[in-house]
C-alpha cells in the first residue's frame, strides 16, 4: 500500500501562485461583484435604484447602488435586466464604481464591508465571511488562469473532464468556494478544479464504535471485494493480524487524506492508541475530487462506486462533516426513495432516476458525544 501522506508538491506548485495577478484579480472581482449584487438584490437585501425611464432595445435599464458611508460614499452604476421571479442579469462590462465621484477599482471584499449592515452580517461573522469570499476569488482566479476547453469540445468530453472544467460552482451562493482549512498545497491536491490524483486513506474501525449499513442488494463482504479487490483485502487483514487485532472485529473505512492528517489523528487519538481505529495506509486507486469537494470518482476503476467522506473544512457556511447517526439510516432511506421512484409510472415515463447512497460507515467519538448536546461542527 502507499504510505507517504506528505509528499511535497513541486516548487512550482507549492510556492508560485501564477493565478494571483492584477488583471485576473480585477476580472474575477468584476464577475463576482455582479453575482453578489444580483443575488443580494434578488433576496431583497439590496435595492438598486433605477436610473432610466425606459429599458433599451435589449430590455436593459441602468441602476445605481449607493453605499452611504460617512467618509467615503461609494456609488455603483450598472446595466441590468430584471427577469422572471425578480432575478437580475447584470452586464459585467457596465459595472462601474465611484468614490467621491472619482472612478475606482472594483473590490468585492470592500463591497461586503460597505454593505454589511444591509446584508445583516454581524461583526462576529464578518471576518469568516470575508475569508470565504477571498477563497472564492482565489479559486475563480485559478480557473480563469488556465487554458480551458471550448464548448464544442466539452459536448463530447467525459464527465470527469466536465467536472474539472466547471467554472461557476453553486450558481446562487456568493461565497461558494470558501474551503476554510485548506492551505495553498491542499488546494492543489484536493480541489475539483486542480483535479489531482487523490489516494484515499484506509482505516480499520472497531465494530464496538462503528456502524456499517447498506441497501438490500449489497453486503459488507461483497462491497469491499468490489471496491478493494482480494489482494488489497488480504494485505489489510495481514496488517491487522500483525497488530494482534482480529479482522472479524473491524470494518474497513475510507477517509479523506486531509481529514486524517488534520482532524482524526488528534481528535480520535484515544481510539487510535487503543486500536479502535487502525491506520492501514493509502489505497492504490487514484480518485478525482468532484464539484461537491468531498465526493470522489475512481479514476483507476471507473466501474467502482463514488466515495463521499467527511471533510471538516468550512465551505459555503457549513462544516462538511458527516454524522455517524445519519449514516446509519442513509442507505435505507435511499432504498425506500429509489423504490418509490421506480414504481411511479409518470416518473418512469420521463426516465427519471435518483442517485443512491448505497452503503455507509460511521464511527462514533464517545467523548464529544457526551460533552456536546445538539448540533455541532464536531
Regions found by a protein language model. Name each.
Residues 2-378:
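Nucleotide/phosphate-binding site architecture used for ATP/NTP-dependent chemistry
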